[in-house]
Amino acid sequence: MASQQAPAKDLQTNNLEFTPTDSSGVQWAEDISNSPSAQLNFSPSNNGCWATQELQSLWKMFNSWLQPEKQTKEQMISQLVLEQFLLTGHCKDKYALTEKWKASGSDMRRFMESLTDECLKPPVMVHVSMQGQEALFSENMPLKEVIKLLKQQQSATRPTPDNEQMPVDTTQDRLLATGQENSENECNNSCNATEANVGESCSGNEMDSLLIMQKEQHPEHEEGNVVCQFPHGARRASQGTPSHHVDFPSAPTTADVPMEEQPKDLSRENISEDKNNCYNTSRNAATQVYSGDNIPRNKSDSLFINKRIYHPEPEVGDIPYGVPQDSTRASQGTSTCLQESLGECFSEKDPREVPGLQSRQEQLISDPVLLGKNHEANLPCESHQKRFCRDAKLYKCEECSRMFKHARSLSSHQRTHLNKKSELLCVTCQKMFKRVSDRRTHEIIHMPEKPFKCSTCEKSFSHKTNLKSHEMIHTGEMPYVCSLCSRRFRQSSTYHRHLRNYHRSD
């Protein structure tokens, strides 16, 4: 638990801070060896275990801080609650908060009654634009919920040919849906500044902008893509080094992005081989239009994330890939590009040829498969198609012409055609087995003395499982209980037969 600057006596953290040392990873900077609560009777650690020393240090640290011999449980809980509230980062002025804590006399109830929302930081809002629908959402809202709300807004206010070129304004109802009405003016000003300056650096308290483009295909032509762009905002730039600033594009209106325009995405050949640096070395052929011949005919959304950090030297920024623009501008300087694609599923490997097996024609799957929103359920799509597109049974026995699906099944079957049939044949009853282990297990039946004997009644059994079932008679154990009539059974076969005969209708 990281320490915060707090009152001297009430919070017990005025002179406490973490200092890393060689002997312990986390220790208090103050000397706690003289504290009466820190004098604990720990047995000396002979093995020098670092984990034991660390636990002892933490035990002494918390006893010295909370002082359980002097404070009540409520006082200690209040200290922990206030410390955790300071660690969340929502507090705007920690010093003012500690002053209120001292003024309340370390009483948590009085302290909470005096608190207002003025001590909290303003919420961070994100401007989202998708197919002409715009709204403000909290940065912690899931992306699925954002897309769902924007689709509902689009269905409620579907544009007509007359007003198709007009952008849809952010409504107050959408702000209420995010629970952040109090930051409407600040977020709207930031959105307007973003739309006015495309490709230029951001300044002030402008928020992050999320651009979502979703295209719906016709059954004969094309498949729609969802292109999401998460540029870095000025808020994240303030936390980094001052050597560069962060630039992000504005959300285009419906006039900039026609509804019938083909979706664009990054080609796999245009990404540099050095994936660690994610440096894009090609601008001329950076986009690729997916035609309807290479994309499945059902509707699916693919997610494309493109983050770009610009250096402050060029005056004109690059046009972000994945966002359609009316005209292209020559980019100056260099840019570091982090590209993550969740819609790539390619199969380019040739089928394996197994010598001695039946030949077959196999259709290659080389078209890209776009994953939908529920991409976790679609992940095994490639292996599923590979497995079920081939013939049902591939492996053929050359002696009896039997077909098998797996090689291990064919290998097990071929043992029956071996010349060493004496190893697989029971001498007593002339029964043939596929494995030598099965024959040995079977031969126990023909033995005059059975190896497993009951210690109570000295009855012998050929198998150990039969002995265990027999011993339940002496112990009275009945592990199988019917949940419907509470009858108990000794064996599972008897239990299942009871269910079939008496509780089939239930």
Curated annotation (Swiss-Prot):
GO terms for biological process: telomere maintenance via telomere lengthening. It comes from the Eukaryota. It holds the Pfam family SCAN. GO terms for cellular component: chromosome, telomeric region; nucleoplasm. Transmembrane segments: none annotated. GO terms for molecular function: DNA binding; zinc ion binding. Residues 1-24 are annotated as: Disordered. Keywords: Chromosome, DNA-binding, Metal-binding, Nucleus, Repeat, Telomere, Transcription, Transcription regulation, Zinc, Zinc-finger. Transcription factor required to regulate early development. Binds telomeres and plays a key role in genomic stability by regulating telomere elongation. Acts as an activator of spontaneous telomere sister chromatid exchange (T-SCE) and telomere elongation. This is Zinc finger and SCAN domain containing protein 4F. It comes from Mus musculus.
